[in-house]
Amino acid sequence: MEYNPPNTRERIAARRQRLRQPSSEPAIPGWRRRFIDGLQSGRIVSGAVFVVSCLALFYVLFSSQFRVQTVEVVGVEFLSPERIVNAVPLRGWPIWLIDEEQAVAPLLRSPFVEHARLSLILPDRARIVIVERQPVIYWRSGGVDYLVDRQGFVIEPATVAPPADALVIVDSSNLPVEPQMQLDPDALALARELAWRLPNELGLRPAQIGWDFGLGVFIRTEQDQMVVFGRSERLTRKLMILAYLLNDGTPFTYLDLRPMNPFYQNRTDGRS
């Protein structure tokens, strides 16, 4: 039997040689190293912030604390606050998901509402500011008196008779009138001006202020005289001509001030 002495030194040298050679396989760091690298690079912190932000956003959007609980209505006189709240059902809605303009759109279809604005107040309040149409004129057509605002928009039929000092315009054409339709703004402005200037400048208080589709604005006096003004252009000149005829005592039953050369008639058969 032959004895083979161990080659321990050779084996150790070969092992050291292998360790010195670079490995072709990538080294995989441990979880501690990966955690430290994540902290140093900010990836872990960014991820945590993202998760917390998502949770906070979900809470804010869907938490009951940010749903409308109180609705305040400001500026109503003719309309009741309950009617406004019912027309704009905001209670229970997430405050972040409400479109202010779209929410008040139904209110603008009401003949009583001129403007409407919605304000949202954190965390759970809504305020609706209403500007109502204010009736300043009565428009009488077909025996019905309609409330009309300053811009000429018809509000609704009057439920009571006009006061004694109210401005009533009588539509002799009896054209159909409906809420929210706009009447001739020039005719309304002229009627208001005549109602003030005739008594104060000419001492003439009209028995009636009327409007006709073909004539425009006209007045009737207590002596059953009819004076046609038409539209508001050259109003001062028209008033000067009327004042001259009244002061001169010129008899007439019909006076048309629309042409550049006005004309009048004095009918004795009682017709104008």
Curated annotation (Swiss-Prot):
<dbReference type="InterPro" id="IPR050487">
    <property type="entry name" value="FtsQ_DivIB"/>
</dbReference>
<keyword id="KW-1003">Cell membrane</keyword>
<dbReference type="Pfam" id="PF08478">
    <property type="entry name" value="POTRA_1"/>
</dbReference>
<dbReference type="GO" id="GO:0043093">
    <property type="term" value="P:FtsZ-dependent cytokinesis"/>
</dbReference>
<keyword id="KW-0472">Membrane</keyword>
<keyword id="KW-0131">Cell cycle</keyword>
<feature type="domain" description="POTRA">
    <location>
        <begin position="66"/>
        <end position="133"/>
    </location>
</feature>
<dbReference type="InterPro" id="IPR013685">
    <property type="entry name" value="POTRA_FtsQ_type"/>
</dbReference>
<dbReference type="InterPro" id="IPR005548">
    <property type="entry name" value="Cell_div_FtsQ/DivIB_C"/>
</dbReference>
<dbReference type="GO" id="GO:0090529">
    <property type="term" value="P:cell septum assembly"/>
</dbReference>
<feature type="topological domain" description="Extracellular">
    <location>
        <begin position="65"/>
        <end position="272"/>
    </location>
</feature>
<comment type="similarity">
    <text>Belongs to the FtsQ/DivIB family. FtsQ subfamily.</text>
</comment>
<dbReference type="Pfam" id="PF03799">
    <property type="entry name" value="FtsQ_DivIB_C"/>
</dbReference>
<dbReference type="GO" id="GO:0005886">
    <property type="term" value="C:plasma membrane"/>
</dbReference>
<dbReference type="InterPro" id="IPR034746">
    <property type="entry name" value="POTRA"/>
</dbReference>
<protein>
    <recommendedName>
        <fullName>Cell division protein FtsQ</fullName>
    </recommendedName>
</protein>
<keyword id="KW-0812">Transmembrane</keyword>
<comment type="function">
    <text>Essential cell division protein.</text>
</comment>
<keyword id="KW-1133">Transmembrane helix</keyword>
<keyword id="KW-0132">Cell division</keyword>
<dbReference type="InterPro" id="IPR026579">
    <property type="entry name" value="FtsQ"/>
</dbReference>
<dbReference type="GO" id="GO:0032153">
    <property type="term" value="C:cell division site"/>
</dbReference>
<feature type="topological domain" description="Cytoplasmic">
    <location>
        <begin position="1"/>
        <end position="43"/>
    </location>
</feature>
<feature type="transmembrane region" description="Helical">
    <location>
        <begin position="44"/>
        <end position="64"/>
    </location>
</feature>
